[in-house]
Amino acid sequence: MKLLDARKDHYRKLAHEQGFRSRAAYKLKELNQSYRIIGPGFYVLDLGCAPGGWTQMAIKLAGNQGKVMGIDLSYVEEIPGAEILRGDIEDENVVDDVMNYFERKVNAVICDLSPKVSGNWSVDHAKQISLNYDCTKIMDKVLAHKGNAVFKVFDGEYSMEFRDYVKKKFARINLTKPKASRKQSSELYYVCLGFIG
């Protein structure tokens, strides 16, 4: 078995053993260990949350005093400790639902979303970046001053343009790829710290 396959299986097995819905939960855990995106008591919004691995990890990281909401267009099975909303992030009206639930601005916005992939790389990349722009429109209205955000990005033609756009909104931005990501995957994560609006 190749080392890569072994690693992939390791995270999948770990997720199964520890009750997480996807291996992606470990990406957030690793990112949080490096950058402390989510702390105890944080209010966290997970955009594009299906199947729920990041939402589950966010609950764990935010603890009992925290509050977590996940939003996705797809049906997501209920997650104890989180509010799940079936909604479209391309519809800015979801902001009202977010604010009604949290009753104040959130400390972190996390986005690990992917479009339904077509197999045409340039189309999928453009759509994924477009969804991230939609996330920033929501983020601008719900993220507290000095809050944090994470965006998964399919690396490609529009990645740097998106990075430059987001960079203006935060004190610091880091580009990283967690070990739990597949090595051959084009996904990167923009970790954005200290929201300045």
From Swiss-Prot:
Main location: cytoplasm
Keyword Methyltransferase in record: yes
Binding-site residues, S-adenosyl-L-methionine: 52, 54, 72, 88, 112
GO molecular function: RNA methyltransferase activity; rRNA (uridine-2'-O-)-methyltransferase activity
Listed GO biological process terms: RNA methylation
First-level EC class: transferase
Enzyme Commission no: 2.1.1.166
Keywords: Cytoplasm, Methyltransferase, rRNA processing, S-adenosyl-L-methionine, Transferase
Pfam families according to UniProt: FtsJ
Subcellular location: Cytoplasm
Substrates-to-products reaction catalysed: uridine(2552) in 23S rRNA + S-adenosyl-L-methionine = 2'-O-methyluridine(2552) in 23S rRNA + S-adenosyl-L-homocysteine + H(+)
GO CC terms of this entry: cytoplasm
InterPro entries recorded: RNA_methyltr_RlmE, RNA_MeTrfase_FtsJ_dom, rRNA-MeTfrase_E, SAM-dependent_MTases_sf
Active site residues of this protein: 152 (proton acceptor)
Family note: Belongs to the class I-like SAM-binding methyltransferase superfamily. RNA methyltransferase RlmE family.
Role this protein plays: Specifically methylates the uridine in position 2552 of 23S rRNA at the 2'-O position of the ribose in the fully assembled 50S ribosomal subunit.
Protein name, entry field: Ribosomal RNA large subunit methyltransferase E
